[in-house]
Each structure stands twice: as structure tokens, then as C-alpha cells.
């Protein structure tokens, strides 16, 4: 079962199609992870702290909920006499939540889990990770009260790295 079908029922968005992501993680690193060892990868964009090593890097997309309001109007008009019309009606605002997909780069180091993107990026220490749910095409990471839903080309390998680090 995919992450989108679990979260949104049938999966998919009306405005934002599910991105098809091509992995950038080297095959040698994937083989090393599946054998139970953590590879050390070079990260050109991520600034590593002292003593920090990058063990996983891949393209990803984060799913965030975007809430906006739509107006609903209804009413009627009644002609009382010639030139006299009575109008009645009301307007209500209805909240509508849609999913927004943002592409970026997902890193797992020995100290942090980082998603770098133009919007909705995050960086959390691994010790604050409280739950990980893996799906066929993504991961759901919970850090105390904040949950991040990510689409990944190889979610199983990312989950394996997190399991090796925790």
C-alpha cells in the first residue's frame, strides 16, 4: 500500500500529480546498506557539523496540507411590487484542505534527518524521532508533535538506514 492511498484514500491530487522520482543514491551504497553497513557519502549541499557523517542522500518530495477557504453563497429574490424587490441570502466560508507536493533532497546523517527544499524543508536530530511508518513509495516521520510525509524512490533503503542508526 502506498503512502498516498493510506493518507488520501485513492491517492493522487487534483492539482498536483504524484511525482515520479529517479534515485540518485549510488548502487554501491544501496548494496552496503542492505548488507547492514552504513556507507559514508559526500554531501555537496548539506553543511555537516563536526563529527557528522552523511549515510543517505536521495531525491524526495514532501506532502504538506494546505488549507484555504471557499465561499458558498445562496439566496433568493422576490418581486413584491413593480420596482420593489426583496433580496435574502447568506454566505458561508468552508475550509478546504489540499495536498501540496514539494520536491527536494533528503539526507540522513548519523545525527540528523534533513529535507532541503525551496519550501517546507526541515532538519531534526535523530534522537527526537518518535515514529517511522514506511510505505511502498514513501515514509512518514514523526518528531514529537510534527509529522512529515515524504515520497521517496526507495523508501525501504531509507527505513533501513534509520533502523541501523536507532
Label for each model-derived stretch:
Residues 76-82, 110-117:
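Short charge-dense sequence patches
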